[in-house]
Design a protein with these regions (language model features):
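ER/Golgi luminal nucleotide-sugar-dependent glycosyltransferases, focusing on the catalytic module
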Residues: 2-270
């Protein structure tokens, strides 16, 4: 798709002839925020976000879906990476949600799926450290994807989604998944875990395969339903349903493709 709006990517100084660092986890942000900085954590501006204090790479005229940002949210960044990223390793996180690849600096050894940390220099140093990068790269020698530890619900993925977002989106999503993978999508009626945030790290080829499959499913649903303005009966912002169904898609994709995944805590910045 070609968007009429803009999507901006904030990139660090060039470190190789292609113009990209060899390894990058892109940090999606739609506003000015204090972020951990390193040669492998790369802010990417969504929804037309600009920051005059850093280098900004405009995608004007390039293949993007920035005009869908209200509904697709962080998926607009994921689409931009699919079309333009040339890193040796690629990942996506958010300005308040980061993956951690080494134990957090805290005494609790039973880390939850989501680990809150204060927004301090010490936290940023920890998240952007070489130790994190090296551990991440070593994990990718063994695993296909690094993903957040899953959120575990007392009910199935299907039931929890319908309770939160309603049956309309779920029904269309299941039909689209069946178009992509075949009739059997019983995974959702058996699994109680899901990977939140559309957050991951992987290799370029595995990313491209995943992203193309994801957008075939999500775009088909959006083509049927379009932008949803108001649904009083659902709990969360209904216009963001493409992002919500994408979160559930990741678990199904991992299951169907038989991928090896490493599940790691997600840091939530207070």
């Amino acid at each position: 798709m070609n968007g009429m709006a803009k999507i901006a990517a904030v990139v660090p100084p060039v470190t190789d002839p292609r113009g990209f660092p060899s390894m990058a986890v892109y940090v999606a942000t739609h506003k000015r925020a204090t972020l951990p900085r390193s040669d492998w954590l790369t802010p990417i501006g969504l929804n037309g976000y600009r920051d005059e204090n850093v280098r900004t790479c405009d995608a004007d005229g390039a293949d993007n879906i920035a005009h869908l940002n209200r509904s697709y949210v962080e998926l607009t960044g994921l689409y931009w990476l699919l079309k333009h990223c040339r890193d040796d390793y690629v990942g996506l996180c958010h300005y308040r949600r980061f993956l951690t690849f080494t134990p957090p600096p805290a005494p609790d050894i039973n880390y939850p799926a989501v680990f809150p940390m204060d927004t301090t220099d010490e936290t940023f140093d920890y998240l952007a450290s070489d130790e994190q990068k090296n551990r991440m790269l070593s994990l990718l020698d063994t695993y296909d994807f690094i993903v957040p530890r899953p959120i575990i619900y007392p009910e199935t993925v299907a039931t929890s989604f319908v309770n939160a977002h309603g049956e309309l989106f779920w029904d269309r999503f299941l039909r689209s998944c069946q178009r992509e993978f075949g009739h059997d999508v019983s995974y959702f009626d058996q699994e109680t875990r899901f990977y939140c945030g559309n957050i991951f790290v992987t290799t370029p080829e595995k990313f491209r395969q995943f992203a193309k499959s994801l957008f075939r499913v999500v775009d088909h649903v959006y083509a049927e339903l379009g932008e949803i303005e108001d649904m009083p009966e659902v709990r969360y912002a209904p216009h963001r349903y493409p992002g919500y169904i994408a979160e559930r898609f990741m678990g199904l994709y991992i299951h169907k493709m038989g991928l090896r995944v490493f599940e790691t805590p997600m840091v939530w910045l207070n």
